[in-house]
Amino acid sequence: DYYKKWYRPDLQSVIVVGDIKPAEVEAKIKRLFGNIPRAKYAAERIYYPVNDNDRMIVATDRDSEQPIMLANLYMKHDVVPDRDKSDISYLRDSYMESLIISMLNARLQELQQQAVPPFLSATAHAGQFLVSRTKDAFRLSFGCRQENVKGSFDAVIAESERARRYGFTESELRRAQERQMKVAERQYTERNDRRNRYFVTKALQNFLSAEPIVTEAFRLEQFRLFTRTVTLEQVNSAAKKLISDKNQVLVVYAPDKPEFNLPSNDTLERYV
């Protein structure tokens, strides 16, 4: 059955966080779990690829408890191989990606300050594509105005496309870097006040997806280096790769109400 097939030592990890004596805890873990035999005919764990797509994939769903129309536009790209995540270039690329997300979100927040904003909410993200381990994605998530769904799409898509085509400015980059440094400095200052959950999360990310575990001091040192050496040209070049007009998937959740007119899939595709 499912339990016997997948709950086995070679796919599991024991994570212990707290004020412990490491040698004693390690010995106890080995004593409790060390004699569990490996499965003779273990099923291979396969990370299935997510295919690329030329034409946008559109999926919609209605729910009576969904209060507004929420759109999620994904732009897929291949993941960084686990073996490359220990390289300093991975931390540098992640730093530039976070700058791009920060600057685009600042632009979207500025639009939302209008007297009548074109959308109810809008944020940009970067990370795992749904539950896939073979694709990551840049994502635009936005709440649409019921009386002007197209206007909401137009505003969000136009802002991301403007960033892709023309990039960001030196002043935008400087402000984003200042925000990043403040976060890194705060994390360093609070490094001795972390709750156990923080360390558990870091260990889980390392075990499940090979995310590197670095100290707050190391991260702060690297961010200072990146702030001095990363250029606007490099960030704008990375933005062109992250924000793409290819490999797009649009997922829309809408209210299940007679008065709400959900556009057809073809119409939603044209909006983008």
Set out the residue ranges of the language-model regions:
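Non-catalytic beta-strand/loop surface segments
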Residues: D1-L11, N35-P81, Y90, S94-K150, ...
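Non-catalytic, conformational "gating/processing" segments within enzyme and secreted inhibitor domains
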Residues: Y2-K30, K246-Q248
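Conserved short loop/turn motifs at secondary-structure junctions
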Residues: Q12-K21, R45-Y47, Q222-R224, D256-K257
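Extracytoplasmic/secreted cell-surface and envelope-processing proteins
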Residues: P22-E26, D82, F260-L262
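Short secondary-structure boundary/capping segments
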Residues: I29-N35, D266-R270
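A common structural junction motif
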Residues: L32-K40, A158-F168
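Acidic/histidine-rich, surface-exposed loop or edge segments in extracytoplasmic proteins
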Residues: K135-A137, V214-L220
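Segments forming glycine/polar-rich beta-alpha architectures that bind adenosine-containing cofactors
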Residues: V230-T231, A238, L242-V272
